[in-house]
């Protein structure tokens, strides 16, 4: 099956630079036969908001410094990056935009490696939660847990009822179209700390009691990704430990996720360039590509 927007990332200079940036040395960093690597997923995979922008399809807000490109540079893989900002699981099998084919069209029997981050946009669950809690936080002056009080288990119920089965179906489709591939489903790095930090309110205007509430929603989403991966033979890449302390409330240079306000990214509440590099590095470590 023809590849879409296939990007050959096999230049020695580019691959060497990527390997050095991740601390990769020796033959493990470069396979003798380049991996046929397809990257799927949403804005966390696409690196939306991270410069430089991939000009091949501006609708997808894809960065050429996203974690798929870092992985490809570090391994010498042949990358077909079909990630797209705003993607939902349904966009694996449906066209997301005119001229943007279903993402799994990029897969075939020759695909060796697939990575993906997906599920956060399904039913608008996570963006709706962040928006609702941000609005409630501003209105409450950061006090109490107005978002939790109003929404209760609405968001986690949506994840369990809708997102989890959709994730499982999407991963099954990936497996059917790329039966010989290693499939890595990445969790989402922490957006909020475990407990409220009063100094963070100016950057992330979430009420103190809603910080753990939002984190619990994200934990449910990651659990759904993990369960789906385990049930379909994919590898789950867990960021719950390695991203601790690198949330949107951390200082610039430490955080992997940019805050809602005063973001250094073009797209807030998304990984910055450091976050994309760290997502790549941890994924390579889990997959034994380091």
List the predicted regions and their residue ranges:
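Structural recognition of the beta-strand scaffold that forms the well-ordered cores
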Residues: 36-41, 45-46, 78-83, 112-117, ...
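Charged, often glycine-rich, active-site loop that binds/positions anionic groups
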Residues: 87-104, 249-263
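Secretory targeting and sorting signals
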Residues: 1-31
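Catalytic His-Asp segment of secreted/periplasmic serine-dependent ester chemistry enzymes
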Residues: 189-290
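Serine-esterase "nucleophile elbow" of acetyl-processing enzymes
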Residues: 32-86, 104-105, 133-139
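Conserved N-terminal glycine/acidic-rich loop preference
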Residues: 113-116, 139-175, 184, 189-236
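Oxyanion-hole/transition-state-stabilizing segment in secreted/luminal serine hydrolases
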Residues: 48, 98-158, 190
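Short amphipathic alpha-helices and their capping/turn segments at secondary-structure boundaries
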Residues: 26-38, 96-115, 168-182, 284, ...
């Amino acid at each position: 099956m023809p590849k879409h927007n296939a990007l050959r990332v096999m230049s020695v200079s580019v691959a060497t630079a990527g390997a050095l940036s991740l601390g990769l040395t020796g033959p493990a960093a470069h396979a003798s036969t380049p991996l046929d690597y397809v990257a799927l997923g949403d804005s966390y995979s696409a690196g939306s908001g991270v410069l430089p922008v991939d000009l091949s399809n501006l609708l997808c807000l894809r960065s050429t410094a996203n974690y798929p490109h870092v992985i490809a540079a570090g391994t010498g893989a042949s990358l077909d990056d079909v990630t797209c900002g705003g993607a939902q699981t349904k966009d694996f099998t449906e066209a997301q935009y005119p001229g943007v084919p279903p993402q799994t069209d990029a897969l075939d029997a020759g695909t060796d490696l697939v990575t993906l981050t997906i599920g956060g946009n399904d039913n608008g669950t996570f963006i709706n939660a962040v928006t609702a809690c941000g609005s409630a936080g501003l209105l409450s002056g950061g006090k109490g847990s107005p978002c939790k009080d109003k929404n209760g288990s609405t968001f986690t119920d949506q994840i369990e009822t809708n997102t989890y089965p959709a994730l499982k179906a999407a991963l099954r489709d990936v497996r059917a179209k790329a039966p010989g591939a290693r499939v890595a489903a990445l969790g989402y790095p922490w957006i909020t700390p475990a407990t409220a930090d009063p100094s963070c309110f100016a950057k992330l205007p979430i009420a103190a009691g809603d910080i753990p509430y939002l984190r619990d929603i994200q934990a449910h989403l990651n659990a759904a990704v993990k369960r789906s991966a385990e049930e379909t033979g994919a590898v789950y890449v867990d960021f719950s430990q390695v991203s601790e302390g690198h949330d949107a409330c951390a200082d610039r240079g430490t955080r992997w996720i940019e805050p809602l306000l005063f973001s250094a990214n073009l797209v807030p509440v998304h990984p910055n360039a450091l976050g994309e590099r760290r997502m790549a590095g941890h994924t390579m470590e889990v997959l034994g590509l380091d």
